[in-house]
Amino acid sequence: MATPIRIKRSAVPGKKPQVTDLQVGELALNTYDAELVTLRDNVLYVTGDGDDNNTGKKLGDAKASIAGAVAISTTGDVIRVSAGTYTENNPIALPKQVSIVGDSLREVTVVPQNAGSDLFYVAPGNYLSEMSFTGTMTAGSAICAFNPNKIYYSTQSPYVSNCTNFVTNSIGLKIDGSKSI
């Protein structure tokens, strides 16, 4: 017979376990708020009031930029971007299998700082979702492009879902470094 699952519980309104109270994958339940909490070790946070010197591992210790979170990300990480406008030093080269997920399409705006460069260099298995892109780029620059300095033999495409591109002169997605869609 399988071992029963044990869940830490609290009936105190608003009480959540501290990071030190849970192990990775362990669950806690606040029965008053009907909120289930788990600790994941593969999530990085970005907020408008964050600091790129922070760890990014907790919402209260978030990075200030998407590029700051990407710089410490590894395969399988999810970067959660809180509502706000983020001017990013591009291009930002994403490691394989890294996801960037905004709070909401209408609340997360990303502005490329370097008009002559692509915004994101995507890799196999990347996932971009719930962001809007604004600003101006040089004609031929893209929001998403494969890194022209790397060769990918991909069995897994990058995915872009529920994003809006309002960047003047830009291309949404560049394939093989030069072809656009």
Identify the meaning behind each predicted range.
Residues P13, R40-G68, T85, D103-S104:
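Right-handed parallel beta-helix/beta-solenoid
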